[in-house]
Amino acid sequence: MYLQKKNYCLLCIILLFGAGCSPSGSPTDTPTTGHIKISVDETFSSIIDSELRVFHGLYKYATITPSYVPELQAIQDLLNDSARLAIVTRELNEQEKQYFESLKLYPKSLKIAKDAIALITHPENRDSVITMQQLEQLFSGKLNSWKQLNHRSELDELIVIFDNQNSSTARYIREKFNTELPPYTYAVNTNSEVIGYVASHKNALGVIGVNWISDKDDSASIDFLKMIQVMRIISDSTDTRGKQPYQAYIANGSYPLTRDIYIINREARSGLGTGFVSFVASDKGQRIILKSGLVPATMPVRIVGFQ
């Protein structure tokens, strides 16, 4: 009797302390339960907030805490094991892959959407069209005034505003035009700050992720769109009017400034990170991306304009 009582007490102690912790290295989460942290390119904060809101509604025992940071930091968080997932606009490079291989880890990358870079200006700026050739000159330092774009312009000095010097947007422009950014480009902190700056400075040209102004059901997106105008880009001599970053133009590649969005998962097993990746890639998760104004990886789209 005494032995049975002693064993019962020991079992209670194990359950009491084992419920809140686990042996070192043992999993504490499943695809639909537990708590993990992820790092997300700040450009996509509104989309991932929507994905997480629905995911958490479906799985009440799951908690995913996002950190919205510049892309470079998101990759670094993944390397440092301070984030289970990274949501970014590039795949791992060879050096990063080799680092993970040295740890016997083989992160999986999944394309979840196609994104676009939007160029925005002050609503009173009459220059609403720009060519790819002019953009190349602009970002290489050969063109630094609105009058060089259009001699009839009422504006002179031109300044370019990015969200962050370490952002995916700045990296995209550097790689797209194979150049370092000229001295008349400046960085604030976030995409929303870019919009705010452009809305209050007539001579500014902002470079943002299109999802900040493309969700017709999001009040913040609607308010942002009222503050600025979206430029049309002429890609070649066959394009006479230029195109804005509508979903269909992003999907068929006729809008020239597009990029893919990836989820990179460093889990070596099927944990909560894997569960969230599966959700985002599912029909429900892809519909959230479609609604945001981006192009989902697996669904057809239609043209919806900016108004």
Where are these regions (language model features)?
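Bacterial N-terminal signal peptides
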Residues: C9-A19
